[in-house]
Swiss-Prot record:
Its cofactor is Mg(2+). Substrate binds at T127, I128, D129, R164, M171, G172, R173, E224, R246, H252, I253, Q254, R255. It catalyses: beta-D-fructose 6-phosphate + ATP = beta-D-fructose 1,6-bisphosphate + ADP + H(+). Its main location: cytoplasm. Belongs to the phosphofructokinase type A (PFKA) family. ATP-dependent PFK group I subfamily. Prokaryotic clade 'B1' sub-subfamily. Mg(2+) binds at D105. This is ATP-dependent 6-phosphofructokinase. It comes from Paenibacillus macquariensis. HAMAP family: Phosphofructokinase_I_B1 (MF_00339). Homotetramer. Allosterically activated by ADP and other diphosphonucleosides, and allosterically inhibited by phosphoenolpyruvate.
Length: 322
């Protein structure tokens, strides 16, 4: 089948670099002579037929912007077979031959459903959590880690002044990669993630020893999926009242801001790759990057698997924090 018209949407939680990916899809599509359409507000916009033509001007000056110019939304209706069929019918009525979906796990499930209804689909990993399997990194992850590291640097300054410990809660319900990479990069004394069991007695004892040996601060980075920051602080105080931990929940600040060059480049490569693969006749595929090489994986395979945690990196962080 010859691809003539493609559409792009962003779905689920936004991530820095989504705009760079949209830009790449549009510019690459136009370069290859395709008609390119944008879908506003993800799958909700698809069901509302909120679809518009995109040209070079529509993606001008967006590569450096956070968020998503196409906007995003949750859509309960699309989770139903009737909603999925409606979405596929709208795309066919519009004559759209291919769809590029940018988002996380839920977005991949949606793309997978559409592919089973005969829509040519490509999925790009747009999520700060870095929890998509079959790709080393997701769009937005590098920027989020940079934001967390910057926050920890600032917290370390003030904690050192008062000889206190700091509990930094970061995003990551099921995947602790933000905590892991930011913790390692910032020299955190403790990293708590959902993938690795932890002993609060050991953590409290190590923190006490650090202060006893002259350390002026202690940083604990905890992924939200491993435990509430306030709860971690409470447990530490129960074991040692002198620790005086202060809790900082970084929240949605981790999703905003200008994407790093790494995220812009990753998004640009993946967006262009998705278009070229659609033209080549591929469908129902997830685009990713492994060892700096662009790869295609069946969406079916991705949505039914869990990303492997990098224990080697976790053990390195533990060794360096002694």
């Amino acid at each position: 089948m010859t691809i003539k018209k493609i559409a792009v949407l962003t779905s689920g939680g936004d991530s820095q670099g989504m705009n760079a990916a949209v830009r790449a899809v549009v510019r690459s599509g136009l370069f290859y002579g395709l008609e390119v359409y944008g879908i506003q507000r993800g799958y909700q916009g698809l069901l509302n037929d909120d679809i518009f033509s995109m040209d070079l001007r529509s993606v001008g000056d967006i590569i450096q912007r956070g968020g998503t110019v196409l906007q995003s939304a949750r859509c309960k209706e699309f989770m139903t077979p009737e909603g999925q069929q409606k979405g596929a019918d709208i795309l066919r009525k519009r004559g759209i031959d291919g769809l590029v979906v940018i988002g996380g796990d839920g977005s991949y499930h949606g793309a997978n459903k559409l592919s089973k209804l005969g829509i040519n689909t490509m999925a790009l990993p747009g999520t700060i959590d870095n929890d998509i399997s079959y790709t080393d990194f997701t769009i937005g992850f590098d920027t989020s880690v940079s934001i967390v590291v910057d926050a920890i640097n600032k917290l370390r300054d003030t904690m050192s002044s008062h000889e206190r410990s700091s509990i930094v809660e970061v995003m990551g319900r099921h995947c602790g990669d933000i905590a892991l990479y930011a913790g390692l990069a910032s020299g955190a004394e403790t990293i708590i993630v959902p993938e690795v069991p932890f002993d609060m007695d050991e953590i409290a004892e190590r923190m006490k020893q650090n202060f006893a040996h002259g350390k002026r601060h202690s940083i604990v980075v905890v992924a939200e999926g491993a435990g509430n920051g306030e709860n971690v602080a409470k447990q530490l105080v129960e074991r040692c009242e002198t620790l005086e931990p202060r809790v900082t929940v970084l929240g949605h600040i981790q999703r905003g801001g200008t994407p790093t060059p790494a995220d812009r480049n990753l998004a640009s490569r993946l967006g262009d790759f998705a278009v070229r693969m659609l033209i080549a006749g591929e469908s129902a595929k997830a685009c990713g990057i492994i060892s700096n090489e662009l790869v295609l994986t069946d969406i079916d395979k991705v949505v039914n698997s869990k990303k492997e945690f990098n224990m080697e990196l976790y053990e390195l962080a533990a060794r360096l924090s002694q």
